[in-house]
A protein has these predicted regions:
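Mg2+-dependent phosphoryl-transfer enzymes with acidic/Ser/Thr/Gly-rich catalytic loops
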Residues: 1-4, 21, 193-276
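Active-site glycine-centered loops adjacent to acidic/histidine catalytic or metal-binding residues
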Residues: 8, 42, 226
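Residue-level signal for inorganic ion chemistry
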Residues: 31, 42, 65, 157, ...
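Short, structured coil segments at secondary-structure junctions
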Residues: 56-57, 65, 173-177, 236-237, ...
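Short hydrophobic/aromatic-enriched beta-strand-loop microsegments
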Residues: 58-66, 180-182, 242-244, 258-260
Length: 276
């Protein structure tokens, strides 16, 4: 019986700045050959998928952590943050040393305070590679300045702020208002990197929408992930598979815990589930 397979990218298919292991690439291709459908399910925007990931070959994907759902090159659904919530968030974000980017169908629009955030970050003991990645994140040429933002609906907000007190202040200000996820366990950087989203815009609801479109049930879905923005996906899918490098909270909700992503975890899990 055909299954719908959903794969997070960072920390699941590969670590940031790294390519997926050959075992994962071959296993996903074999699963598709065996009649299953494979989808990305990532916090990344459609325009920021690494080429090495795209080359694997997928039937579609969930992007911006549930903001967009696509089959092939066609976007089927878009789920936006409530405008009232967005306006409230912008008031908070503008009052803090937080660099942020609004993710929309027309691109990512960033605040213009990257230099301030970098100046406030503790750079002591930071490696050259970590500093390079920090600058690539804050000064990504793929983003557009906030002055060009025209009020387009927003899927979610990517944020970057100094670690420590400022990150704690951000969390306290937004607690109970939004879903706040960070990727500090994946990225050893002087800044905290994460996303702010409407609790109703998530990977789980996106999977439900895709299942309705395909005439499938969520029981036919198998989801692979490692981070807190994968929890709704695990609650929705018939089977949730946590990577060995996932946090304890993610592992606790999973039906299966496989090996780490760099230790052939995806290939081993697909074999264990009799999909390849």
């Amino acid at each position: 019986m055909m299954k719908l397979l959903f794969f997070d990218i960072d920390g699941t298919l590969a670590y940031p700045q790294q390519e997926p292991p050959v075992s994962a690439v071959e296993a996903i291709r074999q699963a598709r050959y065996n009649g299953h459908m494979a989808f990305l399910s990532t916090g990344r925007t459609i325009d920021s998928i690494p080429e090495a990931v795209s080359r694997i070959g997928f039937d579609g994907g969930i992007f911006s952590a549930g903001g967009q759902v696509a089959m092939g090159e066609k976007v089927l659904f878009r789920f936006h943050m409530a405008d009232s919530l967005l306006q409230e968030l912008l008031v908070w974000l503008r009052s803090m040393p937080v660099f942020y980017a609004l993710e929309t169908a027309d691109g990512r629009f960033h605040s213009e305070n990257a230099e301030e955030v970098l100046r406030l970050a503790d750079l002591s003991g930071i490696s050259e590679s970590a500093m390079k990645l920090t600058q690539e994140i804050l000064f990504d040429p793929g983003m557009r300045p906030m002055s060009e933002y025209g009020g387009q609906p927003v899927f979610k907000i990517a944020y970057h702020c100094p670690k420590g007190a400022e990150r704690a202040r951000l969390s306290a200000a937004l607690e109970g208002l939004v879903k706040l996820v960070d990727y500090d366990n994946l990225l050893e950087l002087p800044i905290s990197v994460g996303e702010i989203s409407d609790p109703e815009v998530n990977k789980g609801n996106a999977i439900r929408a895709l299942c309705r479109h395909l005439g499938m049930t969520t029981a036919d879905c198998i989801a692979f992930g490692d981070s807190m923005n994968d929890l709704e996906m695990f609650r929705t899918a018939g089977v949730g598979v946590a990577m060995g490098n996932a946090s304890d909270a993610v592992k606790a909700l999973a039906d299966l815990v496989c090996d780490r992503c760099e230790c052939d975890g995806i290939a081993k899990a697909l074999k264990q589930l009799d999909l390849i």
